[in-house]
Amino acid sequence: MKLHGYFRSSAAYRVRIALNLKGLQPAHLPHHLRQGEQCAPAYLAINPQGLVPTLEDDSGTVLTQSLAIIEWLDEVHPSPPLLPKDPLRRAKVRAFALAIACDVHPVQNLKVLARLRQLGVAEEKVAEWAAWANREGLAACETLIAGEPGPFCFGDKPTIADLCLVPQLANARRFGVDVSAYPRLLKAEAAAKEMKAFADAAPDKQSDAE
């Protein structure tokens, strides 16, 4: 199994956590996003979107998009489960994960910020945009789990929600967001970071970390 990623990619970070929780050890193949290595013809032949992560299983099957990869891993390697059994709880976990993966992350990722710069947006405004996107999204996520006792986002075990939350909080801090405004999210993050699977997946622990 091979995982194509980049140490700072929050989408790849999610998948690294899932792989660690499942006890899987793929070969890690880094692609430097800031240097454009994801646009190399050889990589585009694997992932036409030119994004990370991409997972290649032992049969050569290629999977893209972090949440699709994580759900596939959860189905093929069901222990420990990353989604609750109850259909309603599953829907709530997915809604939280999608709020981050679809609504927050895409509008502040490297590709979008680079395009803003190409269009002549001042660096100060680019930074403001990224911080705004994180603040707006995390505030909504805080409300989504405000009534959940925890310690994780949904219950006493990590789910896909936690796999999305921890990397996004790292992004928010990088963009200068004061995350103390989200105590319930920080409670879930603290529980997650006590687990080796999360700690080992952190960007600064990766072979391509800068």
Give short role names for the model-derived ranges.
Residues P81, G150-P151, A199:
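Substrate-binding/catalytic groove segments of enzymes
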